[in-house]
Amino acid sequence: MAPKKKEVTRIAKLNLIGGQAKPGPALASVGINMAEFTKSFNDKTKDQNGKVIPVIITAYKDKSFDYVVKTTPVTYLLKDAAKIKSGAKDPKKQVVATISKEQALEIARYKLVDMTAYDEEAALRMIAGSAKQMGIAIEGVSAYKEKKGN
Protein backbone atom coordinates (compact mmCIF):
# COMPACT_ATOMS: atom_id res chain seq x y z
CA MET A 1 0.00 0.00 0.00
CA ALA A 2 1.27 3.48 -0.87
CA PRO A 3 2.26 5.81 1.97
CA LYS A 4 -0.31 8.43 2.95
CA LYS A 5 0.15 11.87 1.48
CA LYS A 6 0.71 14.68 3.93
CA GLU A 7 -2.12 17.18 4.23
CA VAL A 8 -1.03 20.62 3.02
CA THR A 9 -2.14 23.48 5.26
CA ARG A 10 -0.53 26.39 3.44
CA ILE A 11 1.65 27.31 0.48
CA ALA A 12 3.49 30.60 0.97
CA LYS A 13 5.59 32.59 -1.48
CA LEU A 14 8.10 34.84 0.25
CA ASN A 15 11.09 36.94 -0.75
CA LEU A 16 13.89 36.41 1.77
CA ILE A 17 17.49 37.62 1.96
CA GLY A 18 19.94 34.85 1.10
CA GLY A 19 21.91 33.60 4.10
CA GLN A 20 20.16 36.08 6.42
CA ALA A 21 16.63 34.74 7.01
CA LYS A 22 15.36 35.32 10.56
CA PRO A 23 12.22 34.18 12.37
CA GLY A 24 9.56 36.87 12.06
CA PRO A 25 5.91 37.65 11.29
CA ALA A 26 6.12 36.52 7.65
CA LEU A 27 7.37 33.06 8.64
CA ALA A 28 5.13 32.83 11.71
CA SER A 29 2.03 33.09 9.53
CA VAL A 30 3.13 30.03 7.56
CA GLY A 31 2.89 27.82 10.65
CA ILE A 32 6.22 25.99 10.47
CA ASN A 33 9.18 25.47 12.80
CA MET A 34 10.85 28.83 12.08
CA ALA A 35 14.22 27.98 13.65
CA GLU A 36 14.52 24.79 11.60
CA PHE A 37 13.50 26.56 8.39
CA THR A 38 15.83 29.55 8.83
CA LYS A 39 18.81 27.30 9.60
CA SER A 40 18.11 25.14 6.54
CA PHE A 41 17.41 28.14 4.25
CA ASN A 42 20.49 30.06 5.41
CA ASP A 43 22.72 27.01 4.87
CA LYS A 44 21.29 26.47 1.39
CA THR A 45 21.64 30.15 0.35
CA LYS A 46 24.89 31.15 2.07
CA ASP A 47 26.60 31.56 -1.35
CA GLN A 48 23.94 34.17 -2.30
CA ASN A 49 24.36 36.23 0.87
CA GLY A 50 22.52 39.55 0.74
CA LYS A 51 20.54 38.85 -2.46
CA VAL A 52 16.76 38.71 -2.49
CA ILE A 53 15.68 35.12 -3.06
CA PRO A 54 12.09 33.99 -3.70
CA VAL A 55 11.12 30.84 -1.83
CA ILE A 56 7.95 28.75 -2.00
CA ILE A 57 7.19 27.05 1.32
CA THR A 58 4.71 24.19 1.57
CA ALA A 59 3.52 23.72 5.16
CA TYR A 60 1.90 20.47 6.25
CA LYS A 61 -0.59 19.71 9.02
CA ASP A 62 2.07 17.90 11.10
CA LYS A 63 4.15 21.16 11.16
CA SER A 64 6.69 19.76 8.70
CA PHE A 65 7.55 21.69 5.54
CA ASP A 66 9.19 21.59 2.14
CA TYR A 67 10.55 24.57 0.28
CA VAL A 68 11.81 25.45 -3.18
CA VAL A 69 14.37 28.21 -3.69
CA LYS A 70 14.01 30.20 -6.92
CA THR A 71 16.49 32.51 -8.65
CA THR A 72 16.77 36.20 -7.74
CA PRO A 73 14.10 38.34 -9.50
CA VAL A 74 15.14 40.07 -12.74
CA THR A 75 14.43 43.53 -11.34
CA TYR A 76 16.99 43.08 -8.55
CA LEU A 77 19.57 41.72 -11.00
CA LEU A 78 19.02 44.61 -13.43
CA LYS A 79 19.26 47.23 -10.68
CA ASP A 80 22.46 45.58 -9.42
CA ALA A 81 23.99 45.49 -12.92
CA ALA A 82 23.03 49.12 -13.57
CA LYS A 83 24.14 50.15 -10.05
CA ILE A 84 20.90 52.01 -9.34
CA LYS A 85 18.47 51.89 -6.40
CA SER A 86 15.22 52.12 -8.39
CA GLY A 87 13.91 52.25 -11.93
CA ALA A 88 12.57 55.26 -13.80
CA LYS A 89 9.39 56.96 -12.61
CA ASP A 90 8.29 57.27 -16.26
CA PRO A 91 10.19 54.60 -18.25
CA LYS A 92 8.60 55.65 -21.57
CA LYS A 93 10.27 59.06 -21.35
CA GLN A 94 13.26 58.46 -19.11
CA VAL A 95 16.30 56.17 -19.27
CA VAL A 96 18.00 56.00 -15.86
CA ALA A 97 20.86 53.65 -16.79
CA THR A 98 22.41 51.59 -19.56
CA ILE A 99 23.91 48.12 -19.22
CA SER A 100 25.96 46.13 -21.72
CA LYS A 101 24.60 43.26 -23.78
CA GLU A 102 27.06 40.96 -21.98
CA GLN A 103 25.58 41.91 -18.59
CA ALA A 104 22.07 41.26 -19.91
CA LEU A 105 23.15 37.89 -21.36
CA GLU A 106 24.67 36.94 -18.01
CA ILE A 107 21.34 37.72 -16.31
CA ALA A 108 19.46 35.77 -19.02
CA ARG A 109 21.68 32.70 -18.53
CA TYR A 110 21.20 32.86 -14.75
CA LYS A 111 17.39 33.23 -15.02
CA LEU A 112 16.92 30.68 -17.84
CA VAL A 113 16.10 27.86 -15.37
CA ASP A 114 13.06 29.78 -14.03
CA MET A 115 11.90 31.22 -17.36
CA THR A 116 9.60 29.87 -20.03
CA ALA A 117 12.17 30.78 -22.70
CA TYR A 118 13.77 27.91 -24.61
CA ASP A 119 17.03 29.62 -25.56
CA GLU A 120 19.29 32.49 -24.54
CA GLU A 121 18.03 34.80 -27.30
CA ALA A 122 14.41 34.51 -26.13
CA ALA A 123 15.52 34.95 -22.51
CA LEU A 124 17.51 38.04 -23.52
CA ARG A 125 14.39 39.56 -25.12
CA MET A 126 12.45 38.91 -21.90
CA ILE A 127 15.21 40.59 -19.87
CA ALA A 128 15.21 43.51 -22.34
CA GLY A 129 11.45 43.91 -21.88
CA SER A 130 11.84 44.03 -18.10
CA ALA A 131 14.71 46.49 -18.44
CA LYS A 132 12.65 48.73 -20.72
CA GLN A 133 9.82 48.83 -18.16
CA MET A 134 12.36 49.97 -15.56
CA GLY A 135 13.93 52.66 -17.75
CA ILE A 136 17.15 50.70 -18.28
CA ALA A 137 18.60 50.51 -21.79
CA ILE A 138 20.66 47.57 -23.04
CA GLU A 139 23.37 48.39 -25.58
CA GLY A 140 22.53 46.87 -28.96
CA VAL A 141 19.35 45.08 -27.85
CA SER A 142 15.76 46.00 -28.65
CA ALA A 143 13.00 44.93 -26.28
CA TYR A 144 10.87 44.03 -29.27
CA LYS A 145 11.37 41.26 -31.80
CA GLU A 146 11.80 42.68 -35.30
CA LYS A 147 8.95 41.73 -37.62
CA LYS A 148 9.92 39.89 -40.77
CA GLY A 149 8.46 40.94 -44.09
CA ASN A 150 6.56 44.24 -44.44
UniProtKB/Swiss-Prot annotation:
Q: Which GO molecular function annotations are given, in alphabetical order? A: large ribosomal subunit rRNA binding; structural constituent of ribosome
* Any one Pfam family match given in the protein's UniProt record, by short name: Ribosomal_L11
Q: What's one GO-annotated cellular component?
A: cytosolic large ribosomal subunit
The signal sequence is: none
Keyword rRNA-binding: yes or no? yes
Biological process terms from the Gene Ontology for this record are:
translation
Look up the domain of life of the source: Bacteria
Q: How is it modified after translation?
A: One or more lysine residues are methylated.
- CDD domains noted in UniProt: Ribosomal_L11 (cd00349)
- Role of this protein: Forms part of the ribosomal stalk which helps the ribosome interact with GTP-bound translation factors.
The family annotation for this protein states: Belongs to the universal ribosomal protein uL11 family.
Oligomer status and interactors: Part of the ribosomal stalk of the 50S ribosomal subunit. Interacts with L10 and the large rRNA to form the base of the stalk. L10 forms an elongated spine to which L12 dimers bind in a sequential fashion forming a multimeric L10(L12)X complex.
Q: What is this protein called?
A: Large ribosomal subunit protein uL11
- Gene name linked to the record: rplK
